[in-house]
Amino acid sequence: MFDSNHEQELSKRRTFAIISHPDAGKTTITEKMLFFGKVIRVPGTIKGRGSGKYAKSDWMNIEKERGISITTSVMQFTYKNILMNLLDTPGHQDFSEDTYRILTAVDCCLVVIDAAKGIEERTRKLMDVARIHNTPIITFINKLDRDSRDPIEILDEIEKELKLHCIPISWPISCGKNFQGVYHIYDKIIHLYKSKFRKNFLTLDSFLDGSLNEYLGADLSIHIRQELELIMNVYSKFNKEKFLKGITTPIFFGSALGNFGIDHLLDSLIKWAPSPLYRQSNKRIIKPQERKFTGFIFKIQANMDLKHRDRIAFMRIVSGQYTKGMKLTHVRIKKNIIISDAFSFLAGERISINKAYPGDVIGLHNHGTIKIGDTFTQGEEIKFIGIPSFAPEIFRLIYLKNPLKQKQLKKGLVQLSEEGTVQVFRPILNNDLILGAIGILQFDVVIERLRIEYNIDAVYKKVNIVLARWINCGNHHSLYNLKKSYSSYLAYDISNSLIYLAPSSANLNIVMSQNSDISFNATREQ
C-alpha cells in the first residue's frame, strides 16, 4: 500500500558517502556522526591488533586485525529528525572497485582531506568517479589541531586538481597547538575549540568590537580579520544550485578527533544535500516520487555471518516503497519473488524492517541468483544504468596448495568476484585463474577469506599483466582476427565478457592502433 506521506518521507532522507585517502580521519568522522545520531554512546576510535576495541563500521575479521576499513558499511541514523543513510567506504590505501561502485548509490559525497597533506592519490581517483555523475561534494578539511598546510593553499589545490570551485563556509583560526576554532562565515559566529572561557562560541559583535582580543589575543585577532577579509573578497558566495550540479564545493574546517566541526557538517547535509534523486534506466528516467517500486543492487557481500554462510545483496531503493511481503520482479532472470525478510544495517548488525523508501539501502538474502547491477521492479522491464565494473590495476595468478580443491576454489572466487572484492579472468588458451584488483590488499583479503570461509589454502604468483581493457566490437571479422593474432593476451571475465590483458602500456597502444574498429574500454556496464 502506497503511503500518503511519501513526499514527506522523501524530504526527510539524505543518502551520502564519505570518501578519503588513508588516515585522513574518515572513520573518526563516521563514528562521531553515529555519536551525534545517538547510535553509539562513546565513539570507538581506538582500534588495533589485539586491542579488543574496533570502530563500529569495521566488522570483517581482517579489518579488526589491521585496524582498517576494507568493506563498505551501510549505516542509518537520525539527526534532527532527518534520516541519514551513510555509506562508509574504505579509507585505506588499497581498496576494491566496490569503493568506486558505492558512489553510484548515493546522492551526495563528503570528502575528507588531511590538512597537513592536502589532496592525495586515492581521493583523486574517487573524485573522478563521483564526477561521472556530477555528484554534489561537501569538503571537510580535518586535523586542524595538528600542524597544517596553509588553508588557502589547500583550497587552490582543490580547485586546480579536483576542478571544483571552493566556497569556504567556515574558516580556521590558526592551526596546530594554536588552533582556536573556526569562524562560520554565514552564521557569523566564532566557534571556539576547547575554550578555557565559559563560552563555546562568540557572536559577530564580539568579532567586530575588539573584545575578540580577550579571547584570541591582539596579534591573532588582527591576522584572522585580515584573512577573512581576503577570502570573502576572493571566493564566491554559496549557491545551492551550483553545488547540486557538482560545480562548487562548500568547505568546512575542524578536528574530527577533537569532535569539532562534525555538527556543522551534519547541519550542512540536512540543509543542502539533496533528498533522494532520480536514476536513469535503459528506457526512461525513474523518479523517486513514482508509486511503483524500483531498486538496483550495487553491492553483494558473502558470508557476513559465518554462522549462516549467507550472502547479502545491498539494494538502493529508487522509487515507490518497500513493504514487508511485497512481490517484486527480478528483471534479469524474469522471476517474481516475495520479499518478506529485508533489513537495514548498522555495520555488522541487521535490523528487520517493515517499510523503506527511496534513498534507503536495504539488504536482501541472496542464494546465488542476485548479481551486482540487477534491477528489481513491480513488473516493469527496465535496467538501471551507470553501475560499472572498473578495470583492475594489479594482477596475480592464483593456485592451490591442494589441487583437489579446484572446485571449491572456483566457487569461492565466483562469490568473491560477484561481490566486487576482486575480478576473475580465465585466459582463452589455458585453465589458469588470474585475479585483478584495484589495490594490493584485496589479494590478502581473498586469501584470508578463502581460508576462513571455504577452508582453502591458496597462494599467488606474479603475472606479466599491467593493464586490462574490455573488448567491444560489432564486426565479427575484426574480432576473429584479434583472437587469432593476440589469443595469448585475451581472457573472459566472470560474465564471459572478452578482455585484453596487456603486459605493458606500449603493447596496448600498438594493439589499439592496429585494431581501430575495436573499442578497448576501462569500464564495463554491469
UniProtKB/Swiss-Prot annotation:
Protein name: Peptide chain release factor 3
Function: Increases the formation of ribosomal termination complexes and stimulates activities of RF-1 and RF-2. It binds guanine nucleotides and has strong preference for UGA stop codons. It may interact directly with the ribosome. The stimulation of RF-1 and RF-2 is significantly reduced by GTP and GDP, but not by GMP.
Pfam families given in the database record: EF-G_D2, GTP_EFTU, RF3_C
Keyword annotations from UniProtKB, A to Z: Cytoplasm, GTP-binding, Nucleotide-binding, Protein biosynthesis
Organism of provenance: Buchnera aphidicola subsp. Acyrthosiphon pisum (strain 5A)
Alphabetical GO biological process terms: regulation of translational termination
Disulfide bonds: none
Lineage: Bacteria, Pseudomonadati, Pseudomonadota, Gammaproteobacteria, Enterobacterales
Gene3D superfamilies: P-loop containing nucleotide triphosphate hydrolases (3.40.50.300), Peptide chain release factor 3, domain III (3.30.70.3280), Translation factors (2.40.30.10)
GO terms of molecular function: GTP binding; GTPase activity; guanosine tetraphosphate binding; translation release factor activity, codon nonspecific; translation release factor activity, codon specific
Compartments where located: Cytoplasm
A single Gene Ontology CC term: cytosol
NCBIfam families: prfC, PRK00741.1, small_GTP
Sequence ranges assigned to domain tr-type G in this UniProt record: 11-277
Gene this protein is translated from: prfC
Similarity-based family: Belongs to the TRAFAC class translation factor GTPase superfamily. Classic translation factor GTPase family. PrfC subfamily.
PANTHER family per record: PEPTIDE CHAIN RELEASE FACTOR RF3
Superkingdom of origin organism: Bacteria
Residue sites binding GTP per the record: 20-27, 88-92, 142-145
